Structures are given as C-alpha cells and as structure tokens.
A protein has these predicted regions:
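Alpha-helical DNA-recognition elements
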Residues: 57
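Residue cluster at the C-terminal edge of the helix-turn-helix DNA-binding motif
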Residues: 43, 60-63, 103, 120
Length: 125
C-alpha cells in the first residue's frame, strides 16, 4: 500500500485516518491481531513515535485494544466499528454536500444527480 501524506494536517492524524478506514472496510478484522508499531512505521516510512501517536488515537476511539505484551488487536465490539463507519460516512456526505453548495448545486439537483448515478451504476453491474 502506498502511503502518501500532505502538509494540511499532522502525519499522525493522517495515518490514524488511513488505518481507521482500513478497519471499517475490513482489512483488519474484529478481534484479530493488529500489526506492530514497527511493522506499520516501516510500511509507512515514518518514525515509530509518529505511528505510536496514530495507534493511540485509534485506541482512544475504542477501535484498537492493547493486550499487554501481546500487542494490539482490533476491537471485537462490532458496534464500535459500525459507529466509526457511520461517522466516516456522515463526514464524507457533509463534505460532498458542502462542496456541492459552494458550486451552486440545489438539493433537488443534488438528489437528481445521485439517483442518476446510482441508476447508471446499477445497469453497469
């Protein structure tokens, strides 16, 4: 996986966002071991301290659980993962709507475009 970061926010926050998406998309399964700080830091080409900050964010959100010397696991509480997904979906929709409003898109036109897109997508599957 190619990791890329921008200068708009802290790298640790960007990493937390990437890993959060990976968890809610099922790359890392509920109750299963999570890669170590060193493994992820190497993969992302970042300092282990930066990766540790990112994982602490996910622990504070309840997505990761530290098991002493055994490392971390993804929470087995699927409601925590589902809630994280819902929050991400809402944030995405808010951004899309805000961008549409800034382009002069009305609610009616927005809904029309969404429905048309889904119809095209359904016929292409």
């Amino acid at each position: 996986m190619a990791w890329s970061f921008d200068s708009k926010s802290a790298v640790s926050l960007q990493i937390a966002n990437i890993l959060r998406l990976d968890i809610v998309r099922g790359k890392y399964k509920a109750g299963e071991p999570f890669p170590t700080v060193r493994q992820l830091a190497y993969e992302a080409s970042v300092n282990p301290n930066t990766m540790q900050k990112s994982l602490t964010i996910l622990e504070n959100e309840g997505l990761l659980i530290t098991q002493g010397t055994s490392g971390r696991i993804v929470t087995d509480d699927t409601s925590v993962i589902e809630n994280a997904l819902l929050i991400l979906q809402e944030e995405y929709i808010k951004k899309v709507i805000d961008d549409g409003i800034s382009l002069g898109l009305s609610k009616e036109k927005f809904n029309q475009l969404i429905n048309e897109y889904y119809e095209r997508k359904d016929t292409n599957e």
